[in-house]
């Protein structure tokens, strides 16, 4: 192919001159123009306009260059068009994320009747048997909150402590043969050896640790910390009274009024709010009802308006940063004891703390060793703490007239100086929240309709005005006044130190019982409210508990006399028990056998060596020797089997002293016997002769002492709810705070259990009673969602003959997406599975489980799509306001899903599905583009567009820079080519 020629500047000027002359002649044919063959030479100085026209010619001189320019402009046009579409779709994606979704309600119960297969009902006509199709009744019962409750047959114990005991059992054949068995001593020895050797083969010998790792002092410290670890007593050193009847604290949001949605979490100070009365009587006065309290302010509780010499509180809310709130209680205990020990006075057995425990606001020498300073917002969450501890009353007022500011002199306030309101200013800026009138009055329309016009009035429905002013959201005439209410220094005492010191002398039970009379109510209150003033506080008087130990003679009263044990046996027992003298220990998690009351019982059992053979002498005296040995054999076998199963044979152990020392009822004692464990840790033979044998069995007992027993229990199975939106299926379920529901005396108790062991009963270290989830309970439980496959089916047969069904499709009239209990009166096939009737045919609606609070849940509209794209569980909650807040916080991450995650065509398809029910036309167009890029153009084109989409914000800038560089290169290349041609 012949290469296209590009004219030089001289040639182009000659060609342009000919072109202009031809154009002139064609325009004016009456003129006669001679077109010369040669044009004069190019002048030395070519005009700029002529040079620019020549440059434009060179850029488009050949068809190849024209084709490249066309492709370049098409590429730029496609990029701009695609970027515009993506920007519009991004905005639609953002709107779809925060759009409210469906409301899920689990309170569904209905019935459905459908036709099934042939039943056994028939009629004879001649020789034919004609079957009648009978309807199969399918009973459908909804499951509230998606929680199925199944009976829990095992009681649940909240463990208080575990008692560790050790014992030696002596089995000596001489004890029986003396005076009872004369002829068959060898047979008796063989029988005893056979059983004991079998037991010895299965017992691993080990030594119990000497002494209890939890000493008496450690045990007392643990008990005291669990009860009063955060309790303190403050001596005011005088009579302290709060000076005002009301609190002007406008930095606190007000409780929602007039049906407004709750924007802020519940604040403790709201219970003291004085709202404007809706309707009053004609003779009603504010002074008679509220005293000098302003309507719209907060009331000071009456106990803080009376003389108080002391204050007591039990709360960890004021601790400074040293306190590890997120760590286990054992770590918290060690930290608290360490810091309290640092600030304790050096006086012996005094609970007084040094002033360095206070912050500087409460003591001139305070360094905040224990407590942090009280900030202005603490009055909203802990008003009782501020009223009890503060030495200064700081008002935070937006009421007209306070600090001398009124409407006419508002600009004198530093924040509103030279303030001129414009349309751009915040509507609350430099305005009073409460406007002051000339007087207050009661106005009546008739005898039954009177309303009160207060001295101060304002927009009460803007309950966050003061909070926004406190956070400097706009300039405001804030009035902050400081009123000194107390000048003397405080004296602080620790109840934990008092408990530990006095328990070492008077006993832990005596001290706890006396302290509970004073602090018992506080320990059951929340950390924000456990603050009360007290007048003339004194520490309780303790009494020593001296309980005389019964002698061995008294123990034997009313019981049959045991035969004396030989001196040789006593010596062996003393040798064997030498290492057990202090082996009252904790093998598992035993907290206390150091209680002084229990010590006597421990020694009783430890020193009371059971001679098994003697326990049966009275039963076998009247029998023949052979039968006597068989009788003994049966007892040995029973002992061996129980020991191998780690059970205690209570037939041979007197447990009355345990019940007496613990002071428990017969029912609790039955539980103790049932849950007690016996661990054999050594079996050895001390004498082995042809006619005589002796064995010693070393046993360690664990006796579990419960604090609470829960008997009527239900386990929960959390089924959740299915949601299909944006073309995808997801499962939504409430993260319940409890695992078991207990019904004692007809009352629902929701239990959360930790560190549980499933033995004969369920024994737990911690059992907490928590509020349930529901719209009316005030408990905002988290809700989780996860993506599922296109089809989901869960069928679980129940023990009563019904079926638990959760399906994404419907069949046999069974609804989709909701969990239901199905009961049929005959065999029917649903979901390709046979449902059979119960053994007892009964289809009435059965109350399978206790009732739970009503709950309606609104989820985000794109819950399923978000879960599908991310492939993770996304946390939402049961109030739509909280959902919007969480989505707003995660907006950056969610918007990043559009272009920065995955393949570009796949995202277009997902976005098309998401906008189908909101923007159908654009949805089909977007889905078509995604299908074209994925199916037609292939992976290369799709990957290229995915990359272009990823760098879209800077793509146009790079394109423009590239074009400028390309043009400069082309111009330079043309100039060099021209020089070479010349």
Curated annotation (Swiss-Prot):
The keyword Glycoprotein belongs to this UniProt entry's keyword annotation? yes
Marked site: Required for Gag-Env interaction: 12, 15
Superkingdom per UniProt: Viruses
- Keyword DNA damage (UniProt): no
List residue numbers at the site (Cleavage): 127-128, 563-564
PTM note says: Envelope glycoproteins are synthesized as an inactive precursor that is processed by host furin or a furin-like protease to yield a functional hetero-oligomeric complex. A 9 kDa protein corresponding to the N-terminus of the leader peptide may arise through low efficient cleavage by host signal peptidase.
Q: Region Disordered: what ranges?
A: 548-567
Residues carrying covalently attached carbohydrate according to the record: 118, 139, 266, 283, 307, 390, 409, 420, 489, 521, 536, 654, 690, 775, 800, 825
Keywords from the named record: Cleavage on pair of basic residues, Glycoprotein, Host endoplasmic reticulum, Host membrane, Membrane, Signal-anchor, Transmembrane, Transmembrane helix, Viral envelope protein, Virion
Span(s) of short sequence motif Endoplasmic reticulum retention signal: 978-980
Q: What is known of its domains?
A: The ER retention signal plays an important role in establishing the intracellular site of budding.
State the protein's purpose: The surface protein (SU) attaches the virus to the host cell by binding to the cell receptor. This interaction triggers the refolding of transmembrane protein (TM) and is thought to activate its fusogenic potential by unmasking its fusion peptide. The transmembrane protein (TM) acts as a class I viral fusion protein. Under the current model, the protein has at least 3 conformational states: pre-fusion native state, pre-hairpin intermediate state, and post-fusion hairpin state. During viral and target cell membrane fusion, the coiled coil regions (heptad repeats) assume a trimer-of-hairpins structure, positioning the fusion peptide in close proximity to the C-terminal region of the ectodomain. The formation of this structure appears to drive apposition and subsequent fusion of viral and target cell membranes.
Q: Further notes on this entry?
A: Foamy viruses are distinct from other retroviruses in many respects. Their protease is active as an uncleaved Pro-Pol protein. Mature particles do not include the usual processed retroviral structural protein (MA, CA and NC), but instead contain two large Gag proteins. Their functional nucleic acid appears to be either RNA or dsDNA (up to 20% of extracellular particles), because they probably proceed either to an early (before integration) or late reverse transcription (after assembly). Foamy viruses have the ability to retrotranspose intracellularly with high efficiency.
The name of this protein is Envelope glycoprotein gp130
The gene behind this protein is env
């Amino acid at each position: 192919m012949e290469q296209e020629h590009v004219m030089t500047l001289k040639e182009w000027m000659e060609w342009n001159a000919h072109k202009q002359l031809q154009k002139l002649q064609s325009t004016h044919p009456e003129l006669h123009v001679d077109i010369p063959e040669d044009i004069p030479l190019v002048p030395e100085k070519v005009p700029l306009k002529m040079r620019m026209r020549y440059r434009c010619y060179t850029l488009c001189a050949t068809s190849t260059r024209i084709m490249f320019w066309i492709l370049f402009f098409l590429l730029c046009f496609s990029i701009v068009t695609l970027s515009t579409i993506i920007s519009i779709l991004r905005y639609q994606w953002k709107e779809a994320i925060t759009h409210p979704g469906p409301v899920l309600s689990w309170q569904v119960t209905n019935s459905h009747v459908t036709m099934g297969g042939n039943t056994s009902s028939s009629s004879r006509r001649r020789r034919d048997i004609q079957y009648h199709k009978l309807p199969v009744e399918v009973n459908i019962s909804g499951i509230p909150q998606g929680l199925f409750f199944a009976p829990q047959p095992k009681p649940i114990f909240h463990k208080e402590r575990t008692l560790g005991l050790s014992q030696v059992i002596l089995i000596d054949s001489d004890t029986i043969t003396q005076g009872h068995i004369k002829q068959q001593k060898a047979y008796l020895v063989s029988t005893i050896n056979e059983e004991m050797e079998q037991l010895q083969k299965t017992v691993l010998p080990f030594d119990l640790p000497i002494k209890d790792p939890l000493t008496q002092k450690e045990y007392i410290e643990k008990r005291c910390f669990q009860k009063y670890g955060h309790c303190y007593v403050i001596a005011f050193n005088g009579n302290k009274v709060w000076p005002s009847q009301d609190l002007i604290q406008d930095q606190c949001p007000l409780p929602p009024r007039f049906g407004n949605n709750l924007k802020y979490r519940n604040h403790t100070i709201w219970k003291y709010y004085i709202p404007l009365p809706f309707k009053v009587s004609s003779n009603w006065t504010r002074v008679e009802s509220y005293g000098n309290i302003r309507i719209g302010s907060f009331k000071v509780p009456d106990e803080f308006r009376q003389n108080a010499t002391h204050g007591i509180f039990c709360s960890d809310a004021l601790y400074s940063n040293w306190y590890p709130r997120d760590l286990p209680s054992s770590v918290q205990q060690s930290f608290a004891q360490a810091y309290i020990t640092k600030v304790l006075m050096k006086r012996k057995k005094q609970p007084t703390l040094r002033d360095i425990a206070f912050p500087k606001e409460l003591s001139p020498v305070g360094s905040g060793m224990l407590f942090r300073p009280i900030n202005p917002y603490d009055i909203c969450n802990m008003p009782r703490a501020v009223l009890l501890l503060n030495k200064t009353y700081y008002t935070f007022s937006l009421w007209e007239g306070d600090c001398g500011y009124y409407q006419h002199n508002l600009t004198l306030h530093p924040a509103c100086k030279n303030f001129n309101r414009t349309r751009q200013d915040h509507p609350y800026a430099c305005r009073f929240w409460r406007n002051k009138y000339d007087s207050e009055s009661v106005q009546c329309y008739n005898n039954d309709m009177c309303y009160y016009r207060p001295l101060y009035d304002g927009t009460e429905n803007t309950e966050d005005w003061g909070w926004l002013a406190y956070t400097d959201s706009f300039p405001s005439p804030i009035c902050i006044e400081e009123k000194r209410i107390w000048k003397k220094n405080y004296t602080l005492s620790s109840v934990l130190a008092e408990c530990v010191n006095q328990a070492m002398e008077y006993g832990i039970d005596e001290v706890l019982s006396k302290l509970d009379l004073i602090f018992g109510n506080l320990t059951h209150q929340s950390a924000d409210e456990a603050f009360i003033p007290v007048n003339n506080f004194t520490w309780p008087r303790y009494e020593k508990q001296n309980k005389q130990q019964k002698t061995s003679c008294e123990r034997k009263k009313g019981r049959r006399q045991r035969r004396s044990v030989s001196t040789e046996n006593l010596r062996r027992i003393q040798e064997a028990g030498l290492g057990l003298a202090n082996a009252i220990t904790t093998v598992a998690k035993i907290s206390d056998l150091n209680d002084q009351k229990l010590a006597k019982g421990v020694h009783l059992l430890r020193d009371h060596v059971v001679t098994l053979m003697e326990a049966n002498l009275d039963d076998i005296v009247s029998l023949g020797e052979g039968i006597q040995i068989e009788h003994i054999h049966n007892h040995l076998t029973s002992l061996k089997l129980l020991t191998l199963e780690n059970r205690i044979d209570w037939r041979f152990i007197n447990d009355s002293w345990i019940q007496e020392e613990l002071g428990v009822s017969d029912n609790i004692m039955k539980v103790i016997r049932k849950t007690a464990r016996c661990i054999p840790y050594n079996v050895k033979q001390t004498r082995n002769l042809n006619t005589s044998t002796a064995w010693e069995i070393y046993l360690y007992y664990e006796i579990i002492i419960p604090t609470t027993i829960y008997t009527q229990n239900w386990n929960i199975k959390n089924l959740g709810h299915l949601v299909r939106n944006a073309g995808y299926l997801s499962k939504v379920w409430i993260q319940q705070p409890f695992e078991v529901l207990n019904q004692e005396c007809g009352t629902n108790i929701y239990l959360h259990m930790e560190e549980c062991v499933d033995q004969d009963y369920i024994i737990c270290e911690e059992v907490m009673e928590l509020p349930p989830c529901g719209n009316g309970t005030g408990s905002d439980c988290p809700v989780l969602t996860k993506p599922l496959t296109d089809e989901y089916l869960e069928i679980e047969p129940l023990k009563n003959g019904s079926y638990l069904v959760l399906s994404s499709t419907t069949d046999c009239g069974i609804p989709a997406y909701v969990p239901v209990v199905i009961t049929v009166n005959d065999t029917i096939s649903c979901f390709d599975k046979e449902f059979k009737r119960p053994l007892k045919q009964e289809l009435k609606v059965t109350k399978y489980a206790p009732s739970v609070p009503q709950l309606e849940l609104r989820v985000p509209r794109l819950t399923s799509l978000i879960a599908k794209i991310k492939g993770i569980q996304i946390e939402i909650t049961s109030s739509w306001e909280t959902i919007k807040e969480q989505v707003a916080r995660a907006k950056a991450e969610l918007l990043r899903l559009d272009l920065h995650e995955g393949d570009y065509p796949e995202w277009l398809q997902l976005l098309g599905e998401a906008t189908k029910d909101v923007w159908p036309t654009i949805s089909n167009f977007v889905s078509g583009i995604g299908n074209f890029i994925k199916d037609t153009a292939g992976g290369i084109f799709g990957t290229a567009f995915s990359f272009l989409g990823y760098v879209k914000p800077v793509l146009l800038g790079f394109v423009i820079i590239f074009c400028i560089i390309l043009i400069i290169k082309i111009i330079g290349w043309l100039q060099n080519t021209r020089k070479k041609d010349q």
